[in-house]
């Protein structure tokens, strides 16, 4: 995602796209659609061995959850690549986003139960900041669950809520990318 978009900026292919009589949003939506399709195909290919070992419902749920996770990260990578137009800052921010979204549950646990300084105002502020961050970041640590593959019955309603959350994040990130790309002067 990052290398392809930054290469288009560096090779001046973007000038050719912008010369066409198409809205800039079509470029972002087209790229996002392609990246989401690639995320789905990647999730299917990666999960093929699971279909022989796990229950079919659990394998399907795990595959779809992985595809949603990859779609959220691909949308954020597209946003970063379009915003920065350089590989290094976009890659660092995308990796930081993914690491934070994956590790936020651990940060919440550590801030709620500190080793020392429990009850201090610094600990309360750090816990409040981590909790506030958890409200705006996608909960990638919740999907896909390994327990689904080990015999735990998949809860389709909980998965539907996680899928809705993933689709909302993809839509929000795509909207931010379109707004940023529209305001940019080439």
Where are these regions (language model features)?
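Alpha-helix N-cap/start motif
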Residues: 24-25
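Terminal transmembrane helical anchor/hairpin motif
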Residues: 96-179
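Transmembrane helix boundary and interhelical loop/hinge segments in multi-pass membrane proteins
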Residues: 1-18, 32
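Membrane-interface capping segments at transmembrane-helix boundaries
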Residues: 178-186
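Secretory targeting signals
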Residues: 1-4, 28-90, 109, 156
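Short helix-kink/termination motifs in transmembrane helices of multi-pass secondary transporters
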Residues: 8, 40-44, 74-75, 103, ...
């Amino acid at each position: 995602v990052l290398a392809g978009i930054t290469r288009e900026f560096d090779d001046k292919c973007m000038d050719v796209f912008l010369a066409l009589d198409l809205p800039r949003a079509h470029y972002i939506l087209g790229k996002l659609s392609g990246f989401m399709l690639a995320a789905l195909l990647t999730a299917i290919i990666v999960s093929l061995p699971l279909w022989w070992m796990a229950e079919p419902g659990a394998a399907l749920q795990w595959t779809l959850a992985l595809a949603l996770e990859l779609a959220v990260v691909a949308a954020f990578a597209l946003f970063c690549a379009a915003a920065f137009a350089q590989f290094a800052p976009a890659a660092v921010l995308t990796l930081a986003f993914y690491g934070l979204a994956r590790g936020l549950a651990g940060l919440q646990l550590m801030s709620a139960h500190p080793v020392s300084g429990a009850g201090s105002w610094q600990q309360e502020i750090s816990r409040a900041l981590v909790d506030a961050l958890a409200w705006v970041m996608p909960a990638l640590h919740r999907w896909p669950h390994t327990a689904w593959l080990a015999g735990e019955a998949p809860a389709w309603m909980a998965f539907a809520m996680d899928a809705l959350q993933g689709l909302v994040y993809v839509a929000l990130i795509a909207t931010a990318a379109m707004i940023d790309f529209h305001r940019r002067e080439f």
